Amino acid sequence: LKHFPLITAHTGCMNTPENTLLSVETALRSEADIIEVDIRVTRDGVAVLAHDEILRLPDGASLSISQSSFEELEGVDLPDGPGHAGTHRLVRLESILPAVKAAGKMLNLDLKADEAIEAAGELTARYGMAGRVLFTGCGAERARKARGRCPFVRRLLNADAGLFRTAGPAEAARIACDDALSAGCSGINIDYRLAGSGLLKAAARQGLPVYVWTVDDPRKMRHYAELGVRGVTTRNVEALVCLKKEWESAPS
């Protein structure tokens, strides 16, 4: 029986607002192995949890994260996003690290800008979490920059979706593996819809585990677990945890 994949709780898991303390706290209370958050950096170098560069405010105004200081942003009420009626404040990456470390979880930092590499790496080192952090959101170029600036943090190559749609699966898999190896990546992170058995086999030959995102359908979770992926990112953490318990209780 294959090992069950690592469970990554996507930010906003279990119907919480994305990139909020509530989302992180909910993920920490779950049986997920890895907590995912999106990372951007303010003008003064503060790593924050945010997907988009432009913050849309309830009154229709907008603010640029990279062009604003953290002090300018920290008091702003931000909409919780689609499906949520509340607001939240911008969260510093540093503020969640002690709880993640204490919980013994891993952290998937989805880097949304090159500037996030050093800010996130410095905090990872300061909190002694190099063994618990993965950098994702890295195409080949960003992965190479991350290796140069923060070689102590493991990276996953974000496979180029466009390549898989244009080059054909075998050639795209070969290029993804070559890019991952040349950038010193620990594995490949890919949209589950592009992760076929050909990629898994090609990556396995190179010693590269494959992680898939974002799988919320329990039937698809089972399919990718059986295919042999190393990790599955999901918003539906409870369903993946249930499948894991069923998987591990099955006779070998």
Task: Identify the function of each model-found stretch.
Residues L1-S252:
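Phosphate-group recognition and catalysis centered on beta-loop-alpha active-site segments
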